[in-house]
Amino acid sequence: MAKLQITLKRSLIGRTVDQQDTVKALGLRKINSTVVKEDNPAIRGMVFKVKHLVEVKEVEA
């Protein structure tokens, strides 16, 4: 199964609380921090919500 490599590229300053909570739930804290998550609809939805703040790459498991 494929995985998603998610990197925080933009600051959370001035963003809505909802967007901040979504980034925190993805496990991202600082700019350029990266996490690898399973590719599933829940994670895709979270990424879509903050797509302007993150960079996503698909990686093989």
Swiss-Prot record:
<dbReference type="InterPro" id="IPR016082">
    <property type="entry name" value="Ribosomal_uL30_ferredoxin-like"/>
</dbReference>
<comment type="subunit">
    <text>Part of the 50S ribosomal subunit.</text>
</comment>
<dbReference type="InterPro" id="IPR036919">
    <property type="entry name" value="Ribo_uL30_ferredoxin-like_sf"/>
</dbReference>
<protein>
    <recommendedName>
        <fullName>Large ribosomal subunit protein uL30</fullName>
    </recommendedName>
</protein>
<dbReference type="Pfam" id="PF00327">
    <property type="entry name" value="Ribosomal_L30"/>
</dbReference>
<dbReference type="GO" id="GO:0003735">
    <property type="term" value="F:structural constituent of ribosome"/>
</dbReference>
<dbReference type="InterPro" id="IPR018038">
    <property type="entry name" value="Ribosomal_uL30_CS"/>
</dbReference>
<keyword id="KW-0687">Ribonucleoprotein</keyword>
<dbReference type="GO" id="GO:0006412">
    <property type="term" value="P:translation"/>
</dbReference>
<dbReference type="GO" id="GO:0022625">
    <property type="term" value="C:cytosolic large ribosomal subunit"/>
</dbReference>
<comment type="similarity">
    <text>Belongs to the universal ribosomal protein uL30 family.</text>
</comment>
<keyword id="KW-0689">Ribosomal protein</keyword>
<dbReference type="InterPro" id="IPR005996">
    <property type="entry name" value="Ribosomal_uL30_bac-type"/>
</dbReference>
